């Protein structure tokens, strides 16, 4: 299966298997760049937060894992920095993983304190503040404003 046909299947899968915890969509100009929005994991200091970022796929996807960047401050991951997560690295990445699997893993990984490229450690209070303020975020790249999706019944 080519990268392009795999990505088309991913788009269909994302629509058919709607989640209340996240959504993602390809950029209008580049099907290899997917903007994502996730809810902070429940029962953590991220709960109530809405976090936006980008998954950069490549021409070898799914053989190579996408890179992940957050745009919304969250106190766990640096913004505008490619993350290198060991559990999501090529050692753990498998070609049968979908973008849905990746986003679910990312949500589950948020509260885990491990040091890696792109990680930061802010206090619980600061993370709670980021979660509260995340509703004011607007993506400069795609124009998505989290205030418009916070009450959306589909998310």
Where do the protein language model's features map onto the residues?
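A general secondary-structure signal for short beta-strands and their flanking turns/coil
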Residues: 31-33, 48-50
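Short, cysteine-centered beta-strand-loop-beta hairpins and adjacent loop/turn segments enriched
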Residues: 41-48, 60
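Proline-anchored loop/turn motifs at beta-strand termini and strand-loop-strand connectors
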Residues: 56-62
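Domain-scale recognition of soluble eukaryotic interaction modules
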Residues: 2-10, 14, 65-155
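N-terminal leader/pro-regions and domain N-caps
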Residues: 1-31
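Conserved, non-catalytic sequence blocks in retroelement Pol enzymes and Pol-derived host proteins
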Residues: 24-28, 42-45, 93-98
